[in-house]
């Protein structure tokens, strides 16, 4: 164990501000109105407002990682007669397929490969051929590769065919501008420790209230019952059904203040985008190649091919970077040898410049 603080170049958990960390130094009572009404309800309102200005949406907070909320939505939104089309081009789309299988949810997995953008015409053909499909689910920012998926085009299809639309916006909400009403999203899922720049501990769902109200009695789980969690928060003014992660919630409330201070989602998106472009330009200058073409990249995380030099080992490269205060991510692509570098969190232009200098120093195979 070390007390050293590293700059996390990961898609979350990520480097947080000192003030977000300090917000956790306060202990809260989960029954107290100062906490439930003064903090939790304020967060719920702020999240809904960030997602859309349209009426008819609500938000639910849920203990656990982002995957808990994905499973809660799938397990609560789909009834026994329903079927979901899962658009998958990475580990997180594949995880939705696995969840659906374990819960006995009828599903059609459209796997377009890890480095391919989903083909909207192919999705159209699937929907046209199978009228039993009632829901569509997909990942927006697929951090397996750094791919940004076309949720707008798929949303238009969902609307045209009258399907319920579920979007895993884990690594995009708060960092990429969006209006879920315009995008025809019925359930948007994200997490505290991503682009809002809080710490791990809970996820959240922003949902069309009419859709959520229809989920009563559907859940395949007690603790992941999205409807029951929502009703508890609605009826008890922010009260969680089970133990609330109070310190994480306080950190998130502070993170929302800092998002507003930065200039909102548009300003944060601009910073992330500039970080990513500077990173890619600098890495290419050092001889690295990106897994994806530029037009496919999200501004969140980038996958780079590993050097072909026989001396290269990711573990050694990682160690040398960590010694200089930087932590990067191993690859998750099954068909290619890659590593990944994220650029979200408390990461600014000077940090990217310092990282590139550290990478040059860590390239032991070039010496």
UniProtKB/Swiss-Prot annotation:
Swiss-Prot/TrEMBL cofactor(s): pyridoxal 5'-phosphate
Transmembrane segments: none
Keyword Nucleus listed: no
Statement: the UniProt record of this protein carries the keyword Transferase: yes
EC nos: 2.6.1.37
InterPro entries documented for this protein: Aminotrans_V_dom (IPR000192), NH2EtPonate_pyrv_transaminase (IPR012703), PyrdxlP-dep_Trfase (IPR015424), PyrdxlP-dep_Trfase_major (IPR015421), PyrdxlP-dep_Trfase_small (IPR015422), SP_NH2Trfase/AEP_transaminase (IPR024169)
Catalytic activity: (2-aminoethyl)phosphonate + pyruvate = phosphonoacetaldehyde + L-alanine
Enzyme class: transferase
In-chain residues carrying the UniProt-annotated modification N6-(pyridoxal phosphate)lysine: 194
GO molecular function, one term: 2-aminoethylphosphonate-pyruvate transaminase activity
Protein's GO biological process: organic phosphonate catabolic process
Superkingdom classification of source: Bacteria
Keywords attached to this entry: Aminotransferase, Pyridoxal phosphate, Pyruvate, Transferase
Function: Involved in phosphonate degradation.
Family of the protein in this entry: Belongs to the class-V pyridoxal-phosphate-dependent aminotransferase family. PhnW subfamily.
Subunit structure: Homodimer.
Entries under HAMAP family matching the protein: PhnW_aminotrans_5
Protein's name in the database: 2-aminoethylphosphonate--pyruvate transaminase
Organism of origin: Salmonella agona (strain SL483)
Gene it is expressed from: phnW
């Amino acid at each position: 164990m070390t007390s050293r603080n590293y700059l996390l170049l990961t898609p979350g958990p990520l480097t947080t501000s000192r003030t977000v960390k300090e917000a956790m130094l306060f202990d809260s009572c989960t029954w107290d109105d100062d906490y439930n009404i003064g903090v939790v309800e304020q967060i719920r309102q702020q999240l809904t407002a960030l997602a859309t200005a349209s009426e008819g949406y609500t938000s639910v907070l849920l203990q656990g990682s982002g995957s808990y909320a994905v499973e809660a939505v799938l397990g609560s939104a789909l009834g026994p007669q329903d079927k979901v089309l899962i658009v998958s081009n990475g580990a997180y789309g594949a995880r939705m397929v696995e969840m659906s299988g374990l819960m006995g949810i009828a599903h059609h997995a459209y796997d377009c490969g890890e480095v391919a953008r989903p083909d909207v015409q192919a999705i159209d053909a699937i929907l046209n051929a199978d009228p039993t499909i009632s829901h569509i689910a997909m990942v927006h920012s697929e951090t397996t590769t750094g791919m940004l998926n076309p949720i707008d085009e798929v949303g238009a299809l969902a609307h045209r065919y009258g399907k319920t639309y579920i979007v895993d916006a884990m690594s995009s909400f708060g960092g990429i501008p969006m209006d879920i009403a315009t995008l025809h999203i019925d359930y948007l899922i994200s997490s505290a420790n991503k682009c809002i720049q809080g710490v791990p501990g809970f996820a959240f769902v922003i949902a069309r209230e009419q859709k959520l109200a229809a989920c009563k009695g559907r859940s395949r789980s007690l603790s992941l019952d999205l409807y029951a969690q929502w009703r508890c928060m609605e009826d008890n003014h922010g009260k969680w059904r089970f133990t609330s992660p109070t310190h994480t919630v306080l950190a998130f409330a502070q993170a929302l203040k800092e998002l507003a201070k930065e200039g909102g989602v548009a300003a944060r998106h601009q910073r992330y985008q500039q970080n990513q472009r500077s990173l890619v330009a600098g890495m290419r200058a050092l001889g690295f190649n990106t897994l994806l073409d530029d037009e496919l990249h999200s501004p969140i995380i980038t996958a780079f091919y590993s050097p072909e030099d026989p001396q290269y080992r990711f573990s050694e490269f990682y160690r040398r970077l960590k010694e200089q205060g930087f932590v990067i991510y191993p690859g998750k692509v099954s068909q290619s040898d890659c590593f990944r570098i994220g650029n979200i969190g408390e990461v600014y232009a000077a940090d990217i410049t310092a990282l590139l200098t550290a990478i040059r120093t860590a390239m032991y195979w070039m010496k």
